[in-house]
């Protein structure tokens, strides 16, 4: 059985970027629901004892009638696991070394990368994610709809940001651009 991990930080640790009410509701309600639904969908299947990455890369092992629901819920679980880890203020440090060099090579500079990341995040119609991924030896920014995960497309995820309104609405209402810009703080 898959279990949602407790956050490694307090709900208020992301303030002022994201307030504790948003973190609490987002993690304990939305994220937990993805885990609950995933567990219900994989019960009594060949994926029951597998991890999320395996599930998402082996969706063809389940009946087609539940495949889309499983992709959405396992994707929501996996994507949010990454999101909370990326946002962990304990791990927060400047991007440097090989990643910094790769970003500069792909986008010109970190500032140009941030602008492009925000721009792509604003293009997501409705709900989805904006990602920095690695394909072969190249970095690129992609977006996915709903809870689709780049690993199902063969990408290695560097990091991503949730642009579903529940991720930012209590703080930013409909101002997704402001949320995306402040997310890098």
Where is each model-derived feature located?
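Feature for soluble, non-membrane regions of globular proteins
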Residues: 1-185
